[in-house]
Amino acid sequence: MKISVRIHWFRRDLRLFDNAALFQALSGNEPVVPIFIFDTAILNQLEDKNDRRVAFIHRALEDMQQQLIKIGSSLEVYTGTPFDVFQQLIKKYSISAVYTNHDYEPYAIERDTAIANLLSSAGISFYTSKDQVIFEKLEVTKDDGTPYTVFTPYANKWRATLEKTGIPAYPSEKKSAQFFQQSPLPMPSLKSIGFIDKGESFPSDTPQMEVMKHYQQNRDIPSLANGTSRLGVHLRFGTISVRQLATKAKATSATFLNELIWRDFYHMILFNFPKVGRGEAFKKAYDAIPWRNNEAEFKRWCEGKTGYPIVDAGMRQLNATGFMHNRVRMITASFLVKHLLIDWRWGEAYFANKLLDFDLAANNGGWQWAASSGCDAAPYFRVFNPTLQTQKFDPQHKYIREWVPEWQELTYPQPMVVHEVARKRVLEVYSTALKQN
């Protein structure tokens, strides 16, 4: 006779504490089987078998497994398509319900619709919860119920809504007795799923209060090791709780909280305007820009050999570590799009492959902001001057010296394009294209 259970499906919520869907699952009478699926539909698209994100996920799963073993349970880790895995699980267990947390990306919505239909046909309930953002979908809207497309009024409404609702807690860690009891199950190795374990070290998942306190003064200085929190990857995969982080930010730093509001804003945009996740400009007129798309110039940008030290430092940091400081992300993105007139989608895809903290909503939002094609984006005539940005945010060249030690040597390349010439060119190209559309 099959055992009657509930299932919690971990995805972007790799933690046992303050987990909304897990809390709901553990609040019933049936034991909860925790599962994770290495989705081959996603893994097969990753060309780099040293992918840091897969290694990060694997490390997070190992940590959860050790916590579960201590309470007599075990994480069940599968490799395959979610559809195939759930067909197996339906045969293995008598499942009353499956619980998981919302995901707002186009692929995830299609996947979850297919799984919901499969489970429904087997008489199994499928419950999803809000967990990776504070406010989602249409929870913060204009007075007429339509989604905001400008950040400042959205942020004001977001804060007002937070004052009314507060931030809920879902203490799933207090209900651990409801986990299904079983002997420890083996964890698949990275090698067994086709990836290489390089023993990567990852940023701490502990929010540093000193970083938050001085965030407004320090956040734009790329040479400061503690100028930013480095929590992006933990928010991406849910190894920390965005609710707990927002609670600390609200009490400590309005500027830090504002970054979490930007994160909610871009997730809201992706959900309500899914075209942006399919490579379309938010502002359709900008799809008419005649990009130069010079492959040799794109290669130099990718490799950090543009002749602009601040741009090259950012790209080299990204290639070496999977991280790039946010101020430098804006500078490098602006340079690719505005100085080189290379399609923002090329840069978006490169960042998507390299960033440890890659998040579709935020990455797309950032690139469309730089290209001026996004909602509430920088105006097209705003072209970052890399030299002035360096003078303002790395005046002693500490960041540049770390990543481009040869920047003052004769071997360092000359700027691949003169700023004033590039600025004049992009303004003419944008102006002409937008007038025609």
Which residue stretches match the model-derived regions?
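Alpha-helical packing segments of well-folded alpha/beta enzyme cores
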Residues: 21, 60, 64, 208, ...
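Trp/Phe/Arg-rich N-terminal binding region typifying the photolyase-homology
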Residues: 1-162, 252, 316, 428-433, ...
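Short alpha-helical segments used as structural interaction elements across diverse proteins
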Residues: 8, 324-326, 420
